[in-house]
A protein has these predicted regions:
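C-terminal transmembrane-bundle signature of multipass membrane proteins
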Residues: 178-238
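Hydrophobic cores of alpha-helical transmembrane segments in multi-pass inner/ER membrane proteins
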Residues: 26-36, 93-106, 162-173, 211-227
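Internal transmembrane alpha-helix with an interfacial aromatic "cap," most often the third helix
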Residues: 36-41, 67-123
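Membrane-proximal helix-loop-helix units in multi-pass membrane proteins
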Residues: 97, 104-169
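Hydrophobic alpha-helical transmembrane segments of multi-pass membrane proteins
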Residues: 55-72, 188, 192-197
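Hydrophobic transmembrane alpha-helical segments in integral membrane proteins
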Residues: 2-35
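Short aromatic-rich membrane-water interface segments that cap or initiate transmembrane helices
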Residues: 15-20, 83-92, 146-161
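Membrane-interfacial loop-to-transmembrane alpha-helix junctions, especially the N-terminal start
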Residues: 47-56, 117-120, 178-187
């Protein structure tokens, strides 16, 4: 067990081809998502669409960072490097995503009434993000492999009530969108979340982010199919 600045502890796993395969899977998945992200961004027609359209690219970068976490856990990277990659993964998964998701939906909505419906989710997401960032900086995080998955444990974020708030922040705003594909994306994320909670709750942070990333193909499909209908007028009224 190795300690880093009293904040992250990495538990190296035994040398195993499984870990190399898992790292490769993350890197390949990141490349696929990166391609999806680039194509999605080429379909953007208004600055308000940019953050939501950037989600596949952000997920691609996120999966890329976890590939290095896998390599670090298997001893291919120096402990300090593994520490930084683990921090980067947790920063996005638990620190930024609860705020970025509702904000991206709020910006994308075409009129003021729709955007106002998103405000509570964005505010809650902002508060959640502030707490998550504080917890990640204040409590030690353990990172280790269990059941072929990476487990990220932080005492400050491992709270049931906080998990419920996290779900509301990341999925809730999508269900209140006027755009059916966004509701579909929210449903896909929620189903993935429930599946992970039922099957591998201990590896929730890693696996749900992976499933959510690949569900972002729905975002590409939406931008592709709606390119003739956008950009929205972004009016003040419905």
């Amino acid at each position: 067990m190795i300690w880093f600045n009293k904040r992250i502890q990495i538990v190296p796993c035994e040398v195993s081809p499984r870990v190399c395969f898992s790292a490769a899977a993350n890197f390949v998945g990141s490349g696929v998502l990166g391609g999806i992200g680039v194509v999605t961004l080429t379909k953007v027609k208004h600055r308000r669409e940019l953050l939501f359209a950037s989600l596949p690219t952000l997920f691609a970068i996120h999966q890329f960072t976890e590939g290095f976490v896998w390599l670090g856990l298997d001893g291919y990277l120096k402990p300090a490097a593994t520490h930084y990659w683990g921090e980067a993964f947790m920063l996005f998964a638990q620190g930024l995503l609860p705020f970025l998701m509702p904000l991206s939906v709020q910006l994308f909505e075409p009129n003021t009434p729709s955007r106002r419906r998103m405000v509570p989710f964005t505010i809650l997401g902002g508060i959640t993000t502030l707490y998550m960032l504080w917890a990640l900086m204040s409590f030690p995080t353990s990172i280790y492999v269990q059941g072929n998955s990476i487990v990220y444990i932080n005492p400050g974020t491992q709270i049931t009530a906080l998990a419920a708030i996290y779900i509301i922040c990341t999925c809730g705003s999508l269900f209140f969108s006027k755009e059916p594909p966004m509701v579909l994306f929210g449903g896909a994320n929620l189903l993935a979340l429930l599946f992970v909670m039922a099957v591998k709750r201990y590896a929730f942070t890693s696996l749900w982010c992976a499933y959510a990333a690949f569900a972002s193909v729905i975002i590409l499909a939406y931008f592709w199919q709606s390119r003739a209908l956008r950009p929205f007028l972004y009016t003040k009224h419905a």
